[in-house]
Regions:
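Terminal, low-structured helical/coil segments at or just beyond the last alpha-helical repeat
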Residues: 95-120
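N-terminal signal peptide c-region/cleavage motif recognized by signal peptidases
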Residues: 17-19
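Bacterial N-terminal signal peptides that target proteins for export
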Residues: 1-8
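Short helix-capping/linker turns of helical repeat alpha-solenoids
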Residues: 23, 34, 38-39, 52-55, ...
């Protein structure tokens, strides 16, 4: 009896994190499908919610939507902010994305902030 109770508790403790992440992963996939089908009004709230929970892919997608103006006016400052938040994760894709975004948004009239300036 004690052994079966321990097994049940162990199973619940080990699978709970997987189950909670499963919902967020599905939300991310749903948001990406909305974005792919240009349903930005449905995609953005899902992506923003995940981005605020430190999902790197969602942070990069939010930055991309701000940079491209998908669903609203372009906002380079917000795009750089979210790219910097993604870069803080240490993910090399996020670093590469942030650098490309900074190069893409740089012009005579706009110089993107460094990440150290963004979080002051």
């Amino acid at each position: 009896m004690k052994l079966s109770l321990k097994i049940i508790v162990f199973t619940v403790v080990c699978t709970f994190p997987l189950l909670t992440n499963a919902g967020t992963y599905l939300d991310l996939q749903k948001a990406l499908v909305f974005k792919e089908h240009k349903q930005y009004g449905k995609a953005f709230p899902l992506l923003l919610q995940l981005a605020e929970k430190e999902f790197v892919r969602a942070q990069m997608e939010v930055a991309d939507m701000y940079a491209e103006g998908f669903g609203f006016l372009k906002n380079n400052d917000e795009a750089i902010y979210w790219a910097c938040r993604a870069d803080q994760s240490g993910d090399y894709r996020a670093l590469k994305f942030r650098i490309k975004l900074a190069l893409k948004t740089t012009s005579d009239s706009y110089q993107p902030k460094q990440c150290s300036q963004v979080f002051k």
